[in-house]
Amino acid sequence: MAGRKGGRAKRRKVCFFTANGITHIDYKDVDLLKRFVSERGKILPRRVTGTSAKYQRKLTVAIKRARQMALLPYVGE
């Protein structure tokens, strides 16, 4: 269990919002928000999605607002 042998180096994930030039995350854009929520309804962490800390905070607020407005479910299907 000391280390990986012959494994590839992990590629750094690029922030989706910085790459596409998105500065404002709208809570009404449900299709965009669904990409960052698991099938169980949980917000995916940064290490999984690759978003920067700045946009992860904005994304979390937008998802919580969308849930409050009943645009997104609190729990998955």
Swiss-Prot record:
GO molecular function per UniProt: small ribosomal subunit rRNA binding; structural constituent of ribosome
Subunit structure and binding partners: Part of the 30S ribosomal subunit. Forms a tight heterodimer with protein bS6.
Function: Binds as a heterodimer with protein bS6 to the central domain of the 16S rRNA, where it helps stabilize the platform of the 30S subunit.
Source species: Bacillus cytotoxicus (strain DSM 22905 / CIP 110041 / 391-98 / NVH 391-98)
Any one Gene Ontology BP term: translation
Family, similarity comment: Belongs to the bacterial ribosomal protein bS18 family.
PROSITE patterns with a match to the protein in the record: RIBOSOMAL_S18
GN (gene name): rpsR
Presence of keyword rRNA-binding: yes
Keywords: Ribonucleoprotein, Ribosomal protein, RNA-binding, rRNA-binding
One protein family per Pfam: Ribosomal_S18
Xref: InterPro entries: Ribosomal_bS18 (IPR001648), Ribosomal_bS18_CS (IPR018275), Ribosomal_bS18_sf (IPR036870)
The protein's name in its UniProt record: Small ribosomal subunit protein bS18
One CC-aspect GO term: cytosolic small ribosomal subunit
